[in-house]
Every structure is written in structure tokens, then in C-alpha cells.
Amino acid sequence: MRNYDLSPLLRQWIGFDKLASSMQGSQEPIDFPPYNIEKKDDNHYRITLALAGFRQSDLDIEVEGPRLTVKGSPAPTEKAVEYLHQGLVFKPFTLSFTLAEHLHVSDAHFENGLLHIDLVRDVPEALQPQRIAIGGGRPALNQQPAEDA
């Protein structure tokens, strides 16, 4: 029997909360850059990438169809450095996310080495569930209305 870990895959799909029950498979985890995906409520999400050492000019965010892509290319250093220990990574990266229908980027800002990308779900009013009022006092379809006496 095979066990599938969907968590690495689901991190790449934003706004598909019921995706786990309909998908099988796995994907190699992405380890750079580290990121969080927050669900604030049913219509608001935030992706936060930890990008210490990057500048805002090193980053590019692009949306094409349902695909959100974040690219980073750090500027080359002018002098060679001999590291005794290198724990900080400065390497180019490309990170892509597939957005659910009606989900779009509302804001992006870079502050203190963190890139925040805010997402909002805007479902058109025609597609939103509508509440139907339940009336009373009407006869059923198969019954004749009572005659006034």
C-alpha cells in the first residue's frame, strides 16, 4: 500500500482548500526560499517569502493566467569572500504558485527581508450562493386552493 504526502504539493496551490481529497501524488519539497502561506479568511491569503540579503530590485513578481511566479536574482558581489561558515544563501530562484479561480494579487511589499504577497478572492455576484426566502401559507402544487366561504 502506498502512502502519499500531499502537503508539499498543496503548498503550491493557493485557495484550493478541498484539493487534498481529490488529488493523489507527491512533489519534491522546495527548500529555497523559505515561505509561509497564510489563510486569513475564506477570501484573503498571504504568501510571505524570507529573502534576507535580497533587495527589492532583485525581485520580480509575475501573474500569467492562474500562475503566480516569483523570481529572484541577487546582484553579484564585487569582491570574492572567503566564508568560514555560510548559512545565508544568495542564489537565484524561481517559485511558482497556482491560484484558484477568482483569486488575484491585491498587493505586494518588501520589508525587512520579507516579501509579502496579498491575495484576494473576488467571486462575481452572479456566481455567489444566493439565499432563497421560504414563504408560508401557499398551497402545495397538488392541492386545490381553499375556496372562500
UniProtKB/Swiss-Prot annotation:
The domain of life is Bacteria
Q: Where is the protein found, in the record's own terms?
A: Cytoplasm
- Describe the location of the sHSP domain by residue ranges: 26-137
Which keywords annotate this record? Chaperone, Cytoplasm, Stress response
State a GO cellular component annotated for this protein: cytoplasm
- Which GO biological-process labels does this protein carry? protein stabilization
| The UniProt record lists the keyword Cytoplasm | yes
- The answer to whether UniProt assigns keyword Cytoplasm to this entry is yes
PANTHER family in UniProt: PTHR47062, SMALL HEAT SHOCK PROTEIN IBPB (PTHR47062:SF2)
Q: What interactions and quaternary structure are annotated? A: Homodimer. Forms homomultimers of about 100-150 subunits at optimal growth temperatures. Conformation changes to oligomers at high temperatures or high ionic concentrations. The decrease in size of the multimers is accompanied by an increase in chaperone activity.
| Family per similarity comment | Belongs to the small heat shock protein (HSP20) family.
The free-text domain note is: The N- and C-terminal flexible termini are involved in oligomerization and in the binding of non-native substrate proteins, and are essential for chaperone activity.
| Cross-referenced HAMAP family | HSP20_IbpB (MF_02001)
Describe the function of this protein: Associates with aggregated proteins, together with IbpA, to stabilize and protect them from irreversible denaturation and extensive proteolysis during heat shock and oxidative stress. Aggregated proteins bound to the IbpAB complex are more efficiently refolded and reactivated by the ATP-dependent chaperone systems ClpB and DnaK/DnaJ/GrpE. Its activity is ATP-independent.
> What protein name is recorded for this chain?
Small heat shock protein IbpB
Lineage, opening ranks = Bacteria, Pseudomonadati, Pseudomonadota, Gammaproteobacteria, Enterobacterales
